[in-house]
Each structure stands twice: as structure tokens, then as C-alpha cells.
Design a protein with these regions (language model features):
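Positively charged n-region of N-terminal signal peptides that target proteins for export
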Residues: 1-5
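N-terminal maturation segment of proteins
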Residues: 20-550
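Bacterial N-terminal signal peptides
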Residues: 6-16
Length: 550
């Protein structure tokens, strides 16, 4: 890692000097200042998302955009130019939030700010207020300093939710309002479990009980008050829900602008519909062909009890990591198994299973493949990117097509690489997983276009997932709400996968032009070294013009 950093700095110093060129370090300085501006003003732990404050931020944003545009990039490397594009995309993201999305004024779930579990992706999915409380970052039992910090955070929640009522009073986004209530109920339950010493918090390293038995009475009182304020807020949402009748999606044109100018997706809303239909059809037809091939084999039965599940996950974790290393897909790193092991899950009775546990109780390597997320997080922790801009997680979930798209692509990649050659029935699960992602992404597109509501989207999502494994349950509802709250997230699993397929195709073409063989391990090393940036930016850095698709 030290060598990578030194090489990166050497690359910076090797840039030719031009009289008009702006030093790259000026971009880094601007980036750090921009991040301070992007966050709201905070008074006594309460962020100011009032209409007046947001209007003031909107008035200042053009000045930041002008400062960025004034940077002279003559002589910059492609990596430095892409760092600038990332900063530009963040500014476009704030512009979109201020003009269109306005989560602080439309979306009640925006005000959920107590998080018990670390997300498996670089930052929290969807828009969220700042600051928020990451319970999993505390070490329990709490130190005196952490008790003080957590007490202050809990104490701020009633005032935050009081401001939320004022900010949301003109919202008419029905689905955001009605379905967002559940996210606040979840926060209430989190606070109740925390106060009762029953809350499990989870991180990359594993889980622990949030033990506050010995905490000061002031912390318990603050938690109780925060929960009451949350319950009162939910009651207020329920009371007004029947009056909410308006659309919640951003519309086709706004969706396309956001995807192209914030997430670097090259397609329009209509083109994404076509692409997701194609992946849904490919996944469904491939599943039926795999079932035909396996028709004389026994069905893949789920683990029947906790002992069987634990044995299955443990043995298949070792098999999975060995496959990655022995088949020369990834280098042997200490964090490979360490990142995945805490995410193995636990046995779930059949009548309580959701889509993903229906898969993992049959073949856990399917989710280990998608859990490349956790390998990403471990790599980011242990091998930080040499770029000071890429080292910081991009705003607006700009990383989604890299994180979710590649995790989805990795499932099929490993199948084709031979992971399930000794268990053909598991290949059926790969196609079921892909069909699920395509169906739910397609549904999310229709919701953003205001051609479906969330209830209709959940039905499409459920009906087009094979074997009725995605039922109209809490998971389906949660996913569709997230994809409504964060435009493009629901499609990123497929669009990112397609972009990865293109990158791999072009990389192999580039090797052919050079008279070399394509080596998957080398390609994966290059891909991972790029950092958590959108795949189209990687393409500009890794692929020569003559090797790109026409």
C-alpha cells in the first residue's frame, strides 16, 4: 500500500508544468471545503433542513460549481480528471436534491437517523440527514466519553422530529409518506431494544450486544424520550396519510438526467427499461434450460435445522475462499475469509424465510458471491486508495453501479468459472437471483416514472421472481421503498452488471490487440485498484480507444 501511494504521488509530480495548469492539490482542497459546505448547518445536534436553509444552500451552490469549472486541467492525468468528474457529480447530486428530490421536504424516512447495523455497501443507501447515529461504531459497554456522545445524539432526536414536521408539512408524495412510516417504526423498535439491552449491532468485524445496563440514567432517559418522539412522529404521519394523494417518482426526464449526470450511467430511462427486460428474459429462459438439464437430479433441499445450516455455511465458506484463490480469481488476502465469516447468517425456520434466506439455506455460496461487498469494505479499510478523493466515499450513492453491479455480476462470473460444476442445481439459483434483480429493478423504473405505485411495483417484483420466492413481505416492501427514495439504486444491480460485462469484454479485446491472453486475475486486480468509482470512469482509465465497443 505504501508503494501504491508513493507511485501515485510520483505520478502527480511527473505531470508537465504548464503556466495555466491548476495543481491537483487545489482540487483536493476544494473537495474538502465542498464536503463541509454540502452538509447542513447544525445547532445543538439538530441539522437545519428548513426551507430557508435549503434556499440559502441552493443560492451558494453555483459558486462552488464555478470554482470547480475554473480549474485548468491542462496536463492532468486521466485519473486526476476523473477525480474532478467525481466532485462534479457530487455537485450535480446536491443540485438534483435541491431541485427535484428534496428528501427533507418530501420523504419522512429521511429523518430516520439511528442505525444499528453497518451497511454492506460503502455508505448508507438512500438519502439520510446528517449527522446520524451509527450505533455499531460504539464499543459496548460504553466509555464515559461515548456515553456523553450517545446521550447528546439521543437528546437531539425530539427536536429533529419537531423540525421534520415543519419541513414535511407541504409534502404530497403519497408512497413516500405511507410506506416511509415503517422505517420510523423500525427506529422506535431499535430504541426500545437499545434501552432494554437487547439490541444487536453489527459491523464488518462482526456483531455485539449494545450493552448499556451500567450506563448513566441520563442516557436511558434520552433514549426513552427519543423513542416517544419517534412514536409521536409516526402517529402524526398516520394521521395525515389519507390526505396524501400525489406522485412520489421523479419522472422519466429527471431520472435520466440524474443517472447520466450523477451516476455516469450512459442510458436513458427508456433504454434502461429495454435492458432490464432483456436481462429478465435471459435469466428466466436460462433458468428453464438449466432446470431441463438437471431434470434427473434431486432437488436442492434447504438446511433442515440450525446444526445443518451452520455446517453448510462453514464448509462452503472454506470452499468458496479456496476457489477464489486456487482458480486465480483473487489474490490470497487475510481479509477474504475474515470479511465473509461474520456475514454467514443463522438458521431461519421455513415459514419465516425471505427471498435471500430461501437461497442461502440451499447454497450459501450464492450470497458469499454477492457478499463481495464485505471484501470491498475490508480492502478499503486495509488498502486505502492512493487518491485522496477516491479514498472518501462519494455522495449520492455514486458508487452504486460499481458496488451493487459488480456484486451481481460476480454471482454469474463465478458460476461460469466453475464454482457449481459439482452442484448443477445451484446454477438454477444464480438465474433466480438475477431474475429477481431484473424484476425489482424494472418495477422501480415504472415507479420513478409514476406509472406504478409501490403496491403495484411489489407485485411485479414478486410475480416475476421465479418459484414465488419473493413474496409480498417486508423485504419486498423495503426494497421498493429504497429504490423510490434513491433513484437508480434498484436498477444499479443490472446496469452495473452490464457495464462490468462491457468492461471485461473490452479488456479482453485490448489484450487481443496486444497479442496477449486475457488473464482474469490481472483484470480483477486492475478493477479493484480503481477504487469505488463508477464503472464508466474505470473504462476511460483501463481501456484504450481502439479496444472500446463501437
Amino acid at each position: 500500500m505504501r508503494l501504491r501511494s508513493l507511485l501515485y504521488l510520483a505520478l502527480l509530480s511527473a505531470v508537465p508544468c504548464f503556466a495555466q495548469s491548476t495543481p491537483y492539490t487545489d482540487l483536493v482542497t476544494l473537495f474538502n471545503q465542498w464536503r463541509a459546505f454540502e452538509h447542513p448547518l447544525v445547532h445543538d445536534g439538530v441539522p437545519d433542513y428548513s426551507a430557508k436553509a435549503m434556499a440559502a444552500q441552493a443560492a451558494e451552490l453555483p459558486k462552488w460549481q464555478k470554482r470547480l469549472a475554473a480549474i485548468n486541467t491542462t496536463g492532468w492525468t486521466i485519473q486526476q480528471l476523473n477525480d474532478l468528474k467525481l466532485v462534479h457529480a457530487e455537485m450535480n447530486g446536491l443540485d438534483f436534491n435541491l431541485r427535484v428530490l428534496k428528501p427533507w421536504a418530501r420523504d419522512p424516512a429521511f429523518y430516520v437517523n439511528v442505525l444499528p447495523a453497518r451497511s454492506d455497501v460503502p455508505s448508507r443507501e438512500g438519502p439520510i440527514l446528517h449527522p446520524y447515529t451509527e450505533l455499531y461504531k460504539f464499543k459496548f459497554p460504553l466509555s464515559a466519553a461515548d456515553q456523553k456522545t450517545l446521550t447528546a445524539s439521543m437528546t437531539a432526536i425530539p427536536a429533529i422530529l419537531t423540525e421534520a414536521r415543519e419541513n414535511l408539512k407541504d409534502s404530497n408524495a403519497r408512497d413516500l409518506w405511507v410506506y416511509g412510516e415503517q422505517e420510523l417504526r423500525n427506529q422506535s423498535q431499535t430504541l426500545a431494544d437499545l434501552d432494554a439491552n437487547k439490541l444487536t449491532v453489527s459491523t464488518l468485524e462482526g456483531s455485539q450486544i449494545a450493552d448499556i445496563k451500567a450506563a448513566d440514567p441520563a442516557l436511558h432517559a434520552a433514549i426513552i424520550n427519543a423513542r416517544k418522539a419517534t412514536d409521536d412522529f409516526v402517529a402524526w404521519l398516520e394521521q395525515l396519510a389519507p390526505t396524501k394523494t400525489g406522485p412520489s417518482g421523479v419522472g422519466k426526464d429527471n431520472y435520466t438526467w440524474y443517472q447520466q449526470n450523477v451516476h455516469f450511467i450512459p442510458w436513458t430511462w427508456d433504454e434502461e427499461v429495454t435492458l432490464l427486460h432483456r436481462e429478465l428474459e435471459r435469466a428466466q429462459s436460462s433458468l428453464r434450460l438449466e432446470e431441463q438439464r438437471n431434470r434427473n437430479l434431486p432437488q436442492l433441499e434447504p438446511a433442515a435445522n440450525a446444526e445443518a445450516f451452520d455446517k453448510l455455511t462453514n464448509t462452503h465458506l472454506d470452499k468458496f475462499v479456496d476457489f477464489l484463490v486456487q482458480q486465480q480469481i483473487l489474490p490470497d488476502k487475510p481479509y477474504l475469509k475474515a470479511a465473509l465469516e461474520p456475514q454467514s447468517g443463522h438458521f431461519v425456520p421455513e415459514d419465516q424465510r425471505i427471498f435471500f434466506t430461501r437461497v442461502t439455506h440451499r447454497e450459501p455460496m450464492l450470497l458469499y458471491s454477492h457478499d463481495y461487498h464485505w471484501i470491498d469494505l475490508a480492502r478499503m479499510r486495509d488498502e486505502p486508495n492512493p487518491s485522496p478523493i477516491r479514498r472518501v466515499i462519494s455522495l449520492s450513492n455514486i458508487w452504486d453501479n460499481r458496488a451493487e453491479g459488480f456484486a451481481t455480476a460476480f454471482e454469474e462470473l463465478l458460476m461460469h468459472a466453475g464454482l457449481y460444476d459439482d452442484n448443477p442445481r445451484a446454477k438454477e439459483l444464480v438465474w433466480i437471483m438475477l431474475a429477481n434483480r431484473a424484476a425489482r429493478g424494472l418495477a422501480s423504473l415504472y415507479v420513478q416514472a409514476n406509472e406504478m405505485n409501490l403496491e403495484q411495483a411489489a407485485k411485479l417484483h414478486s410475480q416475476w421472481t421465479p418459484r414465488s420466492w419473493a413474496r409480498l413481505d417486508k423485504l419486498t416492501g423495503f426494497e421498493q421503498l429504497l429504490y423510490l427514495r434513491q433513484p437508480g439504486y434498484g436498477t444499479s444491480y443490472i446496469t452495473g452488471k452490464l457495464l462490468f460485462d462491457r468492461l471485461m469484454t473490452e479488456s479482453s479485446r485490448q489484450d487481443e490487440i496486444a497479442g496477449q491472453s486475457f488473464v482474469l486475475r490481472d483484470f480483477m486486480d486492475q478493477f479493484n485498484d480503481e477504487g469505488m468509482i463508477p464503472i464508466p470512469l474505470m473504462e476511460t482509465e483501463l481501456i484504450s480507444k481502439e479496444a472500446r465497443e463501437p
